């Protein structure tokens, strides 16, 4: 599953690997990878594979789920497809409450005591997913965990998720992606080394000259 999804993401250009010409993230950090899972929306076969995979993860790890919650905005579509496949209620969670109307942060119904699984497109440092989890907990929901399409497998993300006491499972990850990219001849040994060094310590730009 991990390599299959990784292959899909590479084929449609949802993930770019540029170890020799790094991207600059909004945080200012240099990165050899850029992920835009919104592109999956434009490819029916890919999004169907993702929905089926997320459903499988949820049934395996969170079988008592009662509500599917998407993170705004990237997780909303995938949450909708998964909830439809599972015939479950769905809601989505904003990064913060609206400044108008009812001032809702949670749109749709997620009632006190209900068991909820969060659907996220990408786990980087885990910030947006944890914001979603906290909002649901404040509403009295029991958050069973998070499922996502892809994770960078960053230590900072793992630590934040552990600190928030929330389980998280991804369809694919950085390790599988770099392995598939190497198998496809998209990166060579030197590029693979840079990618491995970046993941060990993203804040240390020494990987650029590795």
UniProtKB/Swiss-Prot annotation:
Binding of 5-phospho-alpha-D-ribose 1-diphosphate, residues: 94, 98, 100, 120-128
Cofactor(s) it depends on: Mg(2+)
InterPro entries: OPRT (IPR023031), Or_phspho_trans_dom (IPR004467), PRibTrfase_dom (IPR000836), PRTase-like (IPR029057)
Broadest EC class assigned to this enzyme: transferase
GO biological process, one term: pyrimidine nucleobase biosynthetic process
Keywords, comma-separated and alphabetical: Glycosyltransferase, Magnesium, Pyrimidine biosynthesis, Transferase
A Pfam family per the record: Pribosyltran
Catalytic activity: orotidine 5'-phosphate + diphosphate = orotate + 5-phospho-alpha-D-ribose 1-diphosphate
Superkingdom of origin: Bacteria
Binding locations of orotate: 124
Entry keyword annotation includes Magnesium: yes
Annotated pathway: Pyrimidine metabolism; UMP biosynthesis via de novo pathway; UMP from orotate: step 1/2
Transmembrane segments: none
GO MF assignments: magnesium ion binding; orotate phosphoribosyltransferase activity
EC number: 2.4.2.10
Subunit structure: Homodimer.
Cross-referenced HAMAP family: PyrE (MF_01208)
Biological role stated in the UniProt entry: Catalyzes the transfer of a ribosyl phosphate group from 5-phosphoribose 1-diphosphate to orotate, leading to the formation of orotidine monophosphate (OMP).
Family: Belongs to the purine/pyrimidine phosphoribosyltransferase family. PyrE subfamily.
Protein's name according to its UniProt entry: Orotate phosphoribosyltransferase
Gene label: pyrE
């Amino acid at each position: 599953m991990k390599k299959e999804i990784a292959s899909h993401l590479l084929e449609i250009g949802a993930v770019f690997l540029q170890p020799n010409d790094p991207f600059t993230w909004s945080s200012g950090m240099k990165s050899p990878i850029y992920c835009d899972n919104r592109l999956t929306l434009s490819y029916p076969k890919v999004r169907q594979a993702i929905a089926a995979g997320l459903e499988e993860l949820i049934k395996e790890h969170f079988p008592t789920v009662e509500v599917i919650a998407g993170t705004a905005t990237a997780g909303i579509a995938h949450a909708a497809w998964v909830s439809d496949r599972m015939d479950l209620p769905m809601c989505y969670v904003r990064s913060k409450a609206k400044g108008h109307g009812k001032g809702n942060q949670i749109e749709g119904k997620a009632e006190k005591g209900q068991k909820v699984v969060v659907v996220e497109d990408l786990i980087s440092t885990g910030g947006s997913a944890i914001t979603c989890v906290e909002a649901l907990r404040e509403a009295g929901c029991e958050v069973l965990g998070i499922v996502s399409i892809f994770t960078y497998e960053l230590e900072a993300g793992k630590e934040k998720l552990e600190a928030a006491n929330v389980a998280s499972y991804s369809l694919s990850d950085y390790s599988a992606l770099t392995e598939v990219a190497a198998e496809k001849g998209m990166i060579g040994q030197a590029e693979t080394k840079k990618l491995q060094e970046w993941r060990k310590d993203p804040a240390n730009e020494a990987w650029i000259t590795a």
